[in-house]
Amino acid sequence: MKIYSLHVGDTKVPYGQFYGGLAGWTGMRGMWRFATDKSHYIIVPIHAYLIDHPQSGLVLVDTGINWEQAHEHDRYYRGVLHYVLDADEYLLTREQELPAQVERLGYRCEDIRTVILTHFHEDHVGGLRYVPEAKVVAAQAEWQALKMKAFGFVPIVYRKSIEGVKVWGPVSFTSGPFHSFDTSQDLFGDGSVMLLPTPGHDPGHLCVLVRMDGYDILITGDIMYTLRHLAVDEVRAILFGGKFLDQQQIDSIRRIQRLRQALHGLVIVPGHDHTDYQYLFLEPFLADGVLSLEEREQIKAYETRLFRDRGHLVPGAMPHFVPPVPGERVGKAA
């Protein structure tokens, strides 16, 4: 089995969306800051993951964004999202479009049999239009959230981005406990791809565990934006889901912490990691679809430099905002 990292665009986000959960970016106050803070932007990558499964064929985890989302905002978005999302929210080149990313590996979008969605947010479902024949798998709880609106007016799901799906596969997590998780879903019945419920970022958010030869890869979606978010008591994303969802988000990350302790060969692949972890390790190491022993050792060495005992960040590893240079709107997170 092989798994490839696909860089399918970038997105402009407020720094506080990624790192403000312990600094007042919570509840309605967090939503207000998310909508109004225009002076602390950072750019982060959007990734999808292509699995070449020996029996079940090509499997895509998340789909990224499409060309219209990035370049035709005013035509694509209507209603509340037209105003909530900035016109320059998404960045996408032709080389980053999902079909181009898949084709550079020698595959075609038409051959993708299964799509797993970690959740239904726009930067994860926009590319569904490129795989209209695939079966789309998502948590039943996420499907039930289709009609929900955050704070009563912001749609959790923009239906236009998912309307082309022909075959849905709702997941109810019926495969029993899996290490630190009370329930799971063995997607293909052979233990090779396990779906794990991680609500919090969204009601039906899930993670994808891919069991490789001698190690495991956990695709975290947005329950962990970056590897540093594993230290949930020190680094926390925006929390605007109410106390119940907020506690679910923290609990989901703690379950990932315990899973990491149970599976010593676990490699964590966060949803939007903009640090060296993504660009010096994950992207280049997954270019051939596998992680060699030497590459896994390099990843573990990086983790050792990042975390102290019990998963706390080492001094100096805490993120901070670097303001943009004069004349620019976007800074960076260091």
Where are these regions (language model features)?
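Generic beta-sheet signal
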Residues: 137-139, 271
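Core dinuclear metal-dependent hydrolase active-site scaffold
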Residues: 2-5, 41, 47-53, 174-213
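Active-site metal-binding loops of divalent metal-dependent hydrolases
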Residues: 8-9, 63-66, 120, 200-202, ...
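Conserved nucleotide-sugar donor-interacting segment of glycosyltransferase catalytic cores
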Residues: 125-135
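Cap/insert and terminal regions of metallo-dependent hydrolase folds
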Residues: 67, 82-100, 213-334
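Metallo-beta-lactamase
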Residues: 1-123, 130, 139-197, 215-221, 241-265, ...
